[in-house]
Amino acid sequence: MLIQRGGLKVVAGLGISGVSAVNFLHEQGYQVAVTDSRPTPPGHDQIPAGVKTSFGQLDQELLLQAEEIILSPGLAPQLPEIQAAIAKGISVVGDIQLLRRATDVPIVAITGSNAKSTVTTLIGLMAKDAGKKVAVGGNLGRPALDLLKDQPELLVLELSSFQLETTSHLNAEVAVVLNMSEDHLDRHGNMLGYHQAKHRIFQGAKKVVFNRDDALSRPLVPDTTPMQSFGLNAPDLNQYGVLRDADGTLWLARGLQRLIKSSDLYIQGMHNVANALACLALGEAIGLPMESMLETLKRFKGLEHRCEYVKTVRDVRYYNDSKGTNVGATLAAIDGLGAAIEVKKGKVALILGGQGKGQDFSPLRSSIEKYAKVVVLIGEDAPVIEQAIQGATKILHAATLKEAVELCQRETQAEDVVLLSPACASFDMFKSYNDRGQQFVACVNSLV
């Protein structure tokens, strides 16, 4: 029989992190209850016996009995039921706060509007390859509290603005906001609210990494906090950046020291150069050897369906960016790959289309004009996209993804890149963006 400790802990909102919090608190011997507005929330069957449940609405009465409320990231603190509890002086936290209380293992904390998952995965691999017992998760993969079961010596956490809203004094070993662009404004009210939520990651941080190309990523921290920057320009002493040789060769660099050519990476594009530099700075902050980090970087092929290198066929590289389901993501992929191959006069053959979700596709125009030799359109919104980009470059149509890949092969030559980055949802032709990406990989593998 577990000893009951302290007052009642009420978990509001189930889902992956809610279930994780309930189980963690129950194992710690706390009196736990859980409430969710859904009648049968996901994970309701994974709640241990002895935990009181109240489903179908957020149980105001139960929340007001709590000593502390653990809020799932999907629920906004602004909800009236939560505000009523706050007005009564009841503490409201999230699973990341519980994690910080439960362990003093060093944390590498990562947030940003884009690239969080790539950087979190890569720095996790760098730490593992350097011999660290590391656990990786948070907003990506495994919920944060579950990571403690591994008894790690280092935690690498991807954190969303929703998770950071209910976290204070994370006291990370090193923290970074990779970049900031408009996102989740429906939840945070405006850009300032979003910015404030993201920057909670720096509270109590021992070291800080920031993106000097993005002023909004730079924190207000005490002058005594060690800070290191990364950016896509020539770096100052001890900072990370890029150096260019006279022949156009691009190097990732620390100060004046050239570390690795961008062409030696599987992950291509300037956005990925920035991600790699961020990882090197984070790795340095936790004492990972440079040699080992560069080895990991050379082998890293990126995340599945996110500008993922597939293979080279007849000196043409193929990339799967099926996760590019909106115009912003596809722009980053075109600009990133286009700028990287421009040095060798390479061009992009782009596969676009699917369900457009009412988006405006005209922002793609100038990048397509600059970097694409051909666009092959697929899916139900092909006519809408064609209208938006008409005249920017050569446009072809394909009835299937297989036909699109074959057309791209016909249109390309050595040093070119074929990129699937549809800027659309996939449900007109595929089960999901995963399915679309897997079919693309299969089509590429069948080329000769």
Swiss-Prot record:
UniProt keyword ATP-binding, yes or no: yes
Listed pathway(s): Cell wall biogenesis; peptidoglycan biosynthesis
Molecular function as annotated in GO: ATP binding; UDP-N-acetylmuramoylalanine-D-glutamate ligase activity
Record-listed E.C. numbers: 6.3.2.9
Subcellular location(s) of the protein: Cytoplasm
Keywords tagged on the record: ATP-binding, Cell cycle, Cell division, Cell shape, Cell wall biogenesis/degradation, Cytoplasm, Ligase, Nucleotide-binding, Peptidoglycan synthesis
Binding site for ATP: G112, S113, N114, A115, K116, S117, T118
Annotated catalysed reactions: UDP-N-acetyl-alpha-D-muramoyl-L-alanine + D-glutamate + ATP = UDP-N-acetyl-alpha-D-muramoyl-L-alanyl-D-glutamate + ADP + phosphate + H(+)
Pfam families per UniProt: Mur_ligase_C, Mur_ligase_M, MurD-like_N
Class of this enzyme: ligase
One of the GO biological process terms: regulation of cell shape
Recorded GO CC terms: cytoplasm
Superkingdom classification of source: Bacteria
Residues of the signal peptide: none
HAMAP family named among the record's database cross-references: MurD (MF_00639)
PANTHER family: UDP-N-ACETYLMURAMOYLALANINE--D-GLUTAMATE LIGASE
Function noted in UniProt: Cell wall formation. Catalyzes the addition of glutamate to the nucleotide precursor UDP-N-acetylmuramoyl-L-alanine (UMA).
Similarity remark: Belongs to the MurCDEF family.
Name of this protein: UDP-N-acetylmuramoylalanine--D-glutamate ligase
Species the sequence originates in: Acinetobacter baumannii (strain ACICU)
Taxon lineage: Bacteria, Pseudomonadati, Pseudomonadota, Gammaproteobacteria, Moraxellales
